[in-house]
Amino acid sequence: MLIYNLFPLLAGPFGDWEPHFKRAADMGFDWIFVNPVQKPGYSGSLYSIVDYFQLNPLLVDPESKLTLEQQLKATLAQAGKLGLKVMVDLVINHCAFDSELTRQHPEWFVQENGNIAHPFCMEDGHKVVWGDLVQFNHPHTSDQEGLYRYCYKIVEYLLDLGFKGFRCDAAYQIPGRIWGRLIREIRQKYPDTLFTAETLGCTADQTKQTAQAGFRLRVQQFQVVGFPRLLVAGAISVSARNCSVH
């Protein structure tokens, strides 16, 4: 399994993706991984999604008479004709701070002192806050079923557009039982769907949790190869341990 990473904003509108698909196929890749294609929030970050059921307007082909969703479906169909399958980033650990979800379902999010909190990380002993993000509280929300059903609808929406799999962003931050149910129920309807888990920066126990949840691959890192703007995702089996990715 060889994965070619196509970054949407570098590739341009959906109608411009076919030459990249052809180049990837000619180099022997069989999967294309694209970063998030849904509508981003005020920061513009592709990983800060404001609306999961709208596509990024920057990817519209102004010369096309098709809707944006139709353009994407046609583009993914072109990949299939070249023998390629396309996976997309599934970002359900967090969303954009300016998403309507924060007002419609505040109980879905991690809160601090009665307010929805921004996620953060520690870097060199300093707290780095992602001010454009809010984190879903998958383990402890009072409406776990509602949040789960919403995530299921996101996956189904992306599959109906023509994607064949997912690179699940920050997968280790979502409980394995939730992933296990989601993967199982999606595969009941879409049996060939590929789920890969991002495990970069997580502990060994967290990696084990993703393996037990039903992920077929874990994506540990990206490696830049000797071509401008081409990124190859290093993916290894979840059953492998203490392996370096090349």
Question: Predicted segments — roles?
Answer:
Residues M1-P13, E18-P19, R23, M27-F29, ...:
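Substrate-binding/active-site clefts of carbohydrate-active enzymes
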Residues L2-L6, I32-V34, V86-V88, F166, ...:
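Hydrophobic faces of well-ordered beta-strands that scaffold small-molecule active sites
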